[in-house]
C-alpha cells in the first residue's frame, strides 16, 4: 500500500521554500521607496561615470573559451562523486569513467585542432 504521509516532509519543504522567496519579493516591493530620476535611471559601474554605449559586441573566441570551461567544469562535477566512491563501485564503473574521460579528451583535441583555444 502506498502511504502518502511519508511525503509530508517533502511537501512542507516545497511549500516553505516557495513561500519564502515570494514573501521576500512582496515585502521588498511594498517597503522599497519609489524614486525615479536621472540618477536612478543611469547605469552604475563601480562609482565610475559610464562612457559610451552599454551594448558591446564580444568576439566569438570568448564564447569558445566559456564553452570549453563549462565542459570541463561539468566533467569535474561528474568525476568528483565517482572518485569519492571509487572503492565501492568496482571495475565496471572505472571503465565507464575512463570512456567518459576519453570522449572529453577527444573533444579537447578537436577544439585544439580547430583553434578554439588560441587567444590571438
UniProtKB/Swiss-Prot annotation:
<keyword id="KW-0150">Chloroplast</keyword>
<dbReference type="GO" id="GO:0008137">
    <property type="term" value="F:NADH dehydrogenase (ubiquinone) activity"/>
</dbReference>
<keyword id="KW-0813">Transport</keyword>
<dbReference type="GO" id="GO:0019684">
    <property type="term" value="P:photosynthesis, light reaction"/>
</dbReference>
<protein>
    <recommendedName>
        <fullName>NAD(P)H-quinone oxidoreductase subunit 3, chloroplastic</fullName>
        <ecNumber>7.1.1.-</ecNumber>
    </recommendedName>
</protein>
<feature type="transmembrane region" description="Helical">
    <location>
        <begin position="9"/>
        <end position="29"/>
    </location>
</feature>
<dbReference type="InterPro" id="IPR038430">
    <property type="entry name" value="NDAH_ubi_oxred_su3_sf"/>
</dbReference>
<dbReference type="GO" id="GO:0030964">
    <property type="term" value="C:NADH dehydrogenase complex"/>
</dbReference>
<comment type="similarity">
    <text>Belongs to the complex I subunit 3 family.</text>
</comment>
<comment type="function">
    <text>NDH shuttles electrons from NAD(P)H:plastoquinone, via FMN and iron-sulfur (Fe-S) centers, to quinones in the photosynthetic chain and possibly in a chloroplast respiratory chain. The immediate electron acceptor for the enzyme in this species is believed to be plastoquinone. Couples the redox reaction to proton translocation, and thus conserves the redox energy in a proton gradient.</text>
</comment>
<keyword id="KW-0874">Quinone</keyword>
<keyword id="KW-1278">Translocase</keyword>
<dbReference type="InterPro" id="IPR000440">
    <property type="entry name" value="NADH_UbQ/plastoQ_OxRdtase_su3"/>
</dbReference>
<comment type="subunit">
    <text>NDH is composed of at least 16 different subunits, 5 of which are encoded in the nucleus.</text>
</comment>
<dbReference type="GO" id="GO:0048038">
    <property type="term" value="F:quinone binding"/>
</dbReference>
<feature type="transmembrane region" description="Helical">
    <location>
        <begin position="64"/>
        <end position="84"/>
    </location>
</feature>
<keyword id="KW-0934">Plastid</keyword>
<keyword id="KW-0812">Transmembrane</keyword>
<keyword id="KW-0618">Plastoquinone</keyword>
<keyword id="KW-0472">Membrane</keyword>
<dbReference type="GO" id="GO:0009535">
    <property type="term" value="C:chloroplast thylakoid membrane"/>
</dbReference>
<keyword id="KW-0521">NADP</keyword>
<keyword id="KW-0520">NAD</keyword>
<keyword id="KW-0793">Thylakoid</keyword>
<dbReference type="InterPro" id="IPR023043">
    <property type="entry name" value="NAD(P)H_OxRDtase_bac/plastid"/>
</dbReference>
<feature type="transmembrane region" description="Helical">
    <location>
        <begin position="88"/>
        <end position="108"/>
    </location>
</feature>
<dbReference type="Pfam" id="PF00507">
    <property type="entry name" value="Oxidored_q4"/>
</dbReference>
<keyword id="KW-1133">Transmembrane helix</keyword>
